[in-house]
Amino acid sequence: MASSYTGLGTELMTTGENAGTWGSTTNTNLQIIEQMVGGYVEQAVTTTTTLSVSDGSTGATLSHRVIKFTGTLSANATVTIPLDVQQMYVLLNGTAGAYTLTFKYVSGSGSTVAWAATDKGTKLVYATADHATNPNMVDSGISSTGAHDLDLSLIHI
């Protein structure tokens, strides 16, 4: 039985597979996991930008925890991701231009996350991969542009 891959590209080896070479595969998987936990990457966007993951490869934009979108928009822009990607992201809208930016799955009618034309803030977003054809994006509502209170009433010291 051959290896399978997660939505973010880590290789799941089957028992007995890759004899003598599993170290290389494991190192690549650990690098991908490191990116998922705390990696930062900048991604230039245009009108439509499709992000993808190559199985068993490091460096995919989507495998990073923090993504800063850059570039000068000349129209409303959309960034799409594959249906099977499930990840918590910190997304920064570092684009120039008074146009909207939307982050969504490549297809389906699930919910999306959008920045207004003048919103150049940061969002904490969960890509749920909760449905095979209509997955949802969950915007935590925590952003760099709003005021938030930290409630410590349930913490016992």
Show where each model-derived region lies.
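Exposed extracellular interaction/assembly regions and N-terminal maturation sites
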Residues: M1-L101, D149-L154
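Extracellular disulfide-bonded cysteine-rich modules/repeats
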Residues: T25, K120-A129, L154
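Tight coil/turn sites that cap or link beta-strands
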Residues: D84-Q86, T118-T122
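A short, surface-exposed interaction/processing loop segment used at functional sites
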Residues: V113-A117
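Glycine/proline-rich low-complexity spacer/linker segments in large multi-domain proteins
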Residues: G141-D151
